[in-house]
Amino acid sequence: MGKFSDIVKSDTPTLVDFYATWCGPCKMMSPVLDRLKDEMGSQVRVLKIDVDKNPDVSDKFKIRGVPTFILFKKGEIVWRQSGGMDINTLKNKIKQAL
């Protein structure tokens, strides 16, 4: 949990994708997140957390459905949403946090 805390405390916005390997919508979001990383580069950090392998982190943030996205900046949650979404929604939320 220490490394996770260090990452989300960064000045760079960090988008955390809480997902599961068995989740269909999570699989559909993978190429969207890859494209987001390509298009936004160093403006954002994307971190994927497998809820089944990391139940402690999932419990801490009360993850009840996947995918759930939480955007952190300087350790604070600035946005949170569950379910699949398009790249423009993600980009807009990240730009608001810059």
Where are the language model's segments positioned?
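A short beta-strand-turn-helix
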Residues: 1-13, 55
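Short pre-active-site segment immediately N-terminal to redox-active cysteine/selenocysteine motifs
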Residues: 11-12, 19-22, 65
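Hydrophobic beta-strand anchors of alpha/beta hydrolase catalytic cores
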Residues: 15-16, 46, 69
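Typically the conserved alpha-helix immediately C-terminal to a functionally engaged Cys/Sec
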Residues: 27-40
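Structural microenvironment flanking redox-active thiols in thiol-disulfide oxidoreductases
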Residues: 51-57
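Non-catalytic, surface beta->alpha helical segment in thiol-disulfide oxidoreductase systems
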Residues: 73-98
